[in-house]
Amino acid sequence: METVYCGVDLHYRSSTFRFLDSSGKTKQAIEIRTDREEIENLLESYQNCNVAYAFEAGNMARYFHRLIESRRNTQKIHVVHPRKFKVITESKHKNDKEDSMKLATGLLKDYLPNPVYIKSEICRQIKSLLNLRRRMVGTRMKIILQAKSLLRGLGIKGSQRSLAGKRGFARAINQLDSETFYKEIIETLAAEALKETGKITSIEQQIKELVDQRFKLEYEWLVSIPGISFVTAATILSVIDDIARFERAGQFSSYCGLIPSEHSSGEKTIHGRITKEGVKELRTLLIQAAWSIARWRKCSDERLARLKKKFYRMSCKQKNTQKAVTAIARHLSRIVFGVLKSKTPYCGVIANRAEACSS
């Protein structure tokens, strides 16, 4: 069966397809609406051929990937990182037809950059629920801050944490018997905050159910690590999907965007700021976990004690706590990798220096 190489330049309204045969000759170049029916009609004309696809990662990539991954004649799917394919990014003649041609040619001649990993459907679902939860937490926080501002204006003191639950709002409302107008406002805000809390609880339950379907053991291993909470563990699992795609701990740390950038020339090496690649939410949560470790008064094991000493040593030497906590977060990412790769719960005992470095 003949193999056809298809380069696709995807956009929201219309997309450009370029089909090449094994000799590199164009069989078809066409622009169609990015519509399921039109795409399927076009691909049906190649049902007697094996088709290899190449397209850039983006908002429409997931949609197109779901359309073609279940087709019987799909031979290969290569999702290209937009910034790493220099043939397109540095081209002086950039348009949809040229881009689709370069993608198809790169696929045929095998000079495309390493493909972008496409996560499983359950990981996408967990990630969507985590994004929804984060938005709801932000909404609840705004409500609590508004209530706190009103109460302070009335001379009623209370911490932000005290208003996080039903009892905290009830105590505040009981102090407003003489302020009927403001009492009604606080009652309304309390009802909204509690409503958001209920939504968050429901979302967390859905996340836990999805995690248990696919990552039950992995989740238990992750939450055994000090500083790793339910949300952090679920985020890690939704982002990495399969730890086997990382060969070394350094690769995982790099994926989290926690390694310093490097500029080397000859014998001169300069390390700059962290790369900040990968998923921002994962990096943020690991840094938050690192802060919690740094602030613990008593460390429960030897490994945490070393991390805490490292934090204070770097803070005093460089006078930069942000760099120090980022270093702890990077070490924490290596621990996460070690736990998932070895398929064992966290262990705080360090047998030797080599083991400490491999964690």
What are these regions (language model features)?
Residues 221-224, 230, 236-317, 357:
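Phosphate-backbone recognition surface of nucleic-acid-processing proteins
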